[in-house]
Amino acid sequence: MTVTPIDPGARIGHVHLKVADLDRALAFYCGVLGFQLMQRRGPQAAFISAGGYHHHIGLNTWESRGGPPPAPGTTGLYHLAVVYPTRAALADALRRLIAAEIPLEGASDHGVSEALYLRDPDDNGVELYWDRPRQEWPRGADGELAMFTRPLDLPALLAERELPARQAAELEG
């Protein structure tokens, strides 16, 4: 069977999550992670974004208001992943989690990326990560991608800071 690949310009536009409590979900996604509320439809739905896009995440209580999370061992969403543009931006996200006392379930270096894993208030898995530049991705002797999973050095990540614009401009020459 010959399969025609998807257009390389295609991407995931958004994820829509069922939540038990819309205000609690907004407090986490907007208050802790820093997403912007783009539109709220009363107590039942909200659309949030990074960078002014119409929405990256939809949140709704249409079928889930007051409900429990899915039972372990059932099918469904494993996690949603939020990509940050720089390592320093991921470090800022980690600082937000620490300040909000949100526990991590894991923190991994995958060679191609560095990632933090946690749960939202509705027990949905959330990954926060940044991608290393492609030229730094690990490759095997055959040239194939050689991802791995190692513990992420959180103190080193927390030491990461965005350079002030003036300082960055001086370094660029």
What residues fall within each predicted segment?
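Vicinal oxygen chelate
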Residues: 1-6, 11-20, 68-173
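Hydrophobic, helix-prone linear segments
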Residues: 3-16, 30, 41, 47
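Conserved beta-strand-loop-alpha-helix junction that forms the acyl-donor binding cleft
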Residues: 19-21, 52, 110-112
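Amphipathic alpha-helical segments
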Residues: 21-36, 96
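Short Gly/charged-rich anion-binding patches and loops
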Residues: 24-25, 43, 92
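Short secondary-structure junctions
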Residues: 34-40, 104-107
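Conserved short beta-strand elements that form part of the metal-binding/catalytic scaffold
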Residues: 36-74, 125-132
